[in-house]
């Protein structure tokens, strides 16, 4: 058995070993199946175009499945040549081409050829520059296609898929050799059409824009493809290991392997309140780790060999060293490993440690430090911070708990300060434990915290509530920070013209039933500030589609009135991205489907590290509102100062939360005397609300009473006549207290003149207690043609007899129309979709395989469904008037304490948005000048006092010229504290003094100039002192 190499007795710079150096093993692949030929690249282009324009997700899956099936039938079972072109970003064999837009533009100008003053040459070189006339600006492949189409004489392309792969391999092999690459690209130019070249360039740039996620491609290719890719990050291995769709992997095949990059577990995005994070831990003690500002790294070691790779599978062994005689890290950490270790895999964060200042340096300095071969003791150096042990001596530890893995980790490694260390961790039990650690992190300019459940398993590529990150902005009441999905956009004008300049964002509507085919999104907010010019170039390169008011996107729910959430263009969810948005507060609005929007919203960052699955949900919006309302009530209860006398306006509820006026409905019988009912409308019915009101009138006319809410301890009978289970009804059913009866019971009771027996046929959902009642079991079952109950729907879905989301055959046919356009015979066969059967896909959505919660603590960590009864509370059981969410929000807005209260941001109560032309309007700044510091009893440094004073005079002018206000430290409307980097000694003191009632932004004075230069408000975190 190979033993680890002993620690070197001499310095790392001494002569290296003379024995043969171990070579990193090349991946082993199974023998690929043999194809009988290839296919024209043109048929793959047709698939790309179909996928890019098809609006229905299920239809895209069927198109992909039909294409794959035809390839297997006609060409063979080796789909690797196709997968490389569908998922170029996952192709490790062609990791880098060394060709970006600028190089491609110059190459094409030469090979077309174009004169340097030719308008099209200028257009290629300035493809990013937006203009009113050029709507394709920002999308280089499209610009190139338009330029080539004017000059290319190729009517029909002759390249095959195999030939294109050979060409791309040649380009990758000749990276850095522009002349050779230019000759190779000429083959593409001479043998493919302009449209085909557009897609080839997209493949080279690894930015396909085909509205299909990798998870969809993997799920259609093979049910186990995603799981296997998570363990190896190797597209070729997935293609050749799983070429047979009928062959399934066993559990061992899905385990991680030494020297194979895997997709690591990720943190779930921050919850709205720290208390929610604690609740997600299920009452258990939890582990608190500091979130580090480095690069996620996995370290593999077997004997003398080392392997380092990033979260996305990039090999960094060349930097850190594959043995003790190479690299900037391995020579210094080899002695840290216990001699009993044969092989091991660690998960951690690679940082830069500066031994002079004794602190970690910013992430941007990592590569410089890693490349430093000087080995000088005082130079910054890589330091690997380990937080997990995943593999040990041939055994995978993924199914072991965090606590088990951490305990064993400390027996495997002896830390070497500044080289390899453990992440600092603490035990927590309450929200205050987290706040205490967060205060320390903020004072030390840290990133945040990670909270881990001690019983959590390690889920490859998973993101669940076992690991939750907590960031400072989610605990300090600095306003609302959300992650929303960009769904539409409006074109700008003037200096913001030339493309999309305002983004319309939405949240995922999780109130809808789980059985819906595709997720729906509810419009929530529009953003017009916060993004830089470079951000807008990227945003405008997205595959925007024209918004048709008569046929709006099906996935997006918008307000019935108003134009605030209607765009000029829109993005399919698969092509879109998550935007981190910060605002002063969430406020009522009838201009968005949510019924709420954000006040003073601005973009903080494009979250390219998040997927659309990380989008905020409607329930989280309501929970945030409830939390904020509770906070305000607690603040109000603690205020002893006199409040201004105010009149609370009577606010009408939204229609869906209100009932009919029953005062004028006469009571005719006492059939339902003493009985209370809550009637739910059918969201799928156009007359749902009207039917609900008529049913309530019938109940009232026959002696019953109606309520708008289901109280926890109420004996109310719930009435519902729909075919699906709306989210609010699901919350009621999940409590297991209330039966859900069909409206037919009401009508039959009225016909009988007395309450009808509670037979099974009348139930949409029956409680466990009800199912044992004699009356319930008198009936044999549902009548012919009746709507299945919620329980039966759930059984059918689980057993596979009904596909989740399906309703009727007619609707299925509507949702998957035939391909009507004419195609030649051969091409038609490639895209022929059999609408009678779905692709052979897993029963769950493709995202489930990477996020399924199979942890030991699943039974305790599941968060209880939020109780939203408060949002539907009305004053009288049979009256229209009440106090719902809108009323509550309005009351808090109108009742304002004189002092120490919750002060609204903005120059007026009515102001809602920033002014893009006067960027600091509505903001208030305190300048930490020497004079102001002394006036507030804080010490100053005299060395730069004069220069700092002069600098702040210039900053003050810039702020005022751009609409901002200069205020004192105790101004309630204070938003920003500005410091000078030459003297930030008062940072912690200013942080403490301005933390109530909510924290303010502390920024360096550079922030002011940077915002003015970009013409927008930037993220304050980038300028924190």
Swiss-Prot record:
Q: Which GO terms describe its biological process?
A: DNA biosynthetic process; DNA recombination; double-strand break repair via classical nonhomologous end joining; nucleotide-excision repair, DNA gap filling
Listed Gene3D superfamilies: BRCT domain, DNA ligase, ATP-dependent, N-terminal domain, DNA ligase/mRNA capping enzyme, Nucleic acid-binding proteins
Q: What is its EC number?
A: 6.5.1.1
Which residues are Mg(2+) 1-binding? Answer: 349
Tell me the segments the record calls region Disordered.
1-36, 773-904
What molecular function terms (GO) are annotated for this protein?
A: ATP binding; DNA binding; DNA ligase (ATP) activity; metal ion binding
BRCT domain: from which residue to which, for each copy?
667-763, 915-1025
Q: Where is the composition biased (Acidic residues)?
A: 775-785, 806-816, 845-870
Alphabetized Pfam families for the sequence: BRCT, BRCT_2, DNA_ligase_A_C, DNA_ligase_A_M, DNA_ligase_A_N
The protein's superkingdom reads Eukaryota
List, as start-end ranges, the regions of compositional bias called Basic and acidic residues.
Answer: 817-838, 891-904
What is the role of this chain? DNA ligase involved in DNA non-homologous end joining (NHEJ); required for double-strand break (DSB) repair.
Q: Which family does it belong to?
A: Belongs to the ATP-dependent DNA ligase family.
This chain belongs to the protein called DNA ligase 4
- Organism of origin is Coprinopsis cinerea (Inky cap fungus)
Q: What is the lineage of its organism?
A: Eukaryota, Fungi, Dikarya, Basidiomycota, Agaricomycotina
| Gene responsible for this protein | LIG4
